[in-house]
Amino acid sequence: MMKTDVVIIGAGAVGCAIARELSKYQIQVMVVDKNEDVGGDASKSNSAIIHTGYDASPGTLESQLVVAANPMYPELVKELDVPFKQIGAILPAITQEQFEQLPAIKAKAFLNRVYDIEYLTKEQIIAMEPNINPEVKGGLHIP
């Protein structure tokens, strides 16, 4: 009978990352999942953006973990020899109300130590994403 020290339930991105990290130690790790292969369900349906934590509640465990994890990705993808391009995201403001919320969103990002968010004009957003709603007022570029 095989001895298992740790059982990880779920073979998505998080479960596999935990298993990979634990494999560095002298313990037996087992990953179980309801699917036949890894990376199913939520992990295969994400937006392919590495979340920066710009909108997490400041001071929470989530914000601390996301901000701490971000610098780890370049080394991780190098070790795994997988393609990686951090292109960021556009947070468009279509309504005036959304546009007026942009400074508060940027301030929240700053509290989470996400400093390189940039304001985008309507023209910049349309140049970056020509198929966006033409009513866009402006937005933020989030790395």
What annotation goes with each model-predicted range?
Residues 17-24, 34, 50, 80-85:
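Active-site substrate-recognition segment that forms the wall
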Residues 107, 136-137:
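Acidic/polar active-site rim loop that often engages polyanionic ligands
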Residues 140-143:
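Helical element adjacent to the flavin cofactor pocket in flavoenzyme catalytic cores
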